Swiss-Prot record:
Keywords: Disulfide bond, Host cell membrane, Host membrane, Host-virus interaction, Hydrogen ion transport, Inhibition of host autophagy by virus, Ion channel, Ion transport, Lipoprotein, Membrane, Palmitate, Phosphoprotein, Signal-anchor, Transmembrane, Transmembrane helix, Transport, Viral ion channel, Virion. Its main location: virion. The record marks H37 as: Essential for channel activity, possibly by being protonated during channel activation, and by forming the channel gate and the selective filter. Cytoplasmic tail plays an important role in virion assembly and morphogenesis. This is Matrix protein 2. When the channel is activated, one or more imidazole moieties of His-37 probably become bi-protonated. Residues 44-97 are intravirion. GO terms for cellular component: host cell plasma membrane; membrane; virion membrane. GO terms for molecular function: monoatomic ion channel activity; proton transmembrane transporter activity.
Amino acid sequence: MSLLTEVETPTRNGWECRYSGSSDPLVIAASIIGILHLILWILDRLFFKCIYRCLKHGLKRGPSTEGVPESMREEYRQEQQNAVDVDDGHFVNIELE
């Protein structure tokens, strides 16, 4: 008998996993981690457009204005708006100092 047929032949107990009734904490922890990983993977595949769109736009909000006086905030907003207000078909070159 070849090795292949020996591997494919079911055992006396059938195709059961020998750890199915185990109460070993390591087996239980591995099972929980595996189930959580599967759930997270399924959610990621279902909602990946929404998740990554939120992350992408969340990172592009700009610098924090916490602790900056209101006059400086307004000046910054005005500069940003002026950089965006251009005719269609033209590019804006912003040089950083």
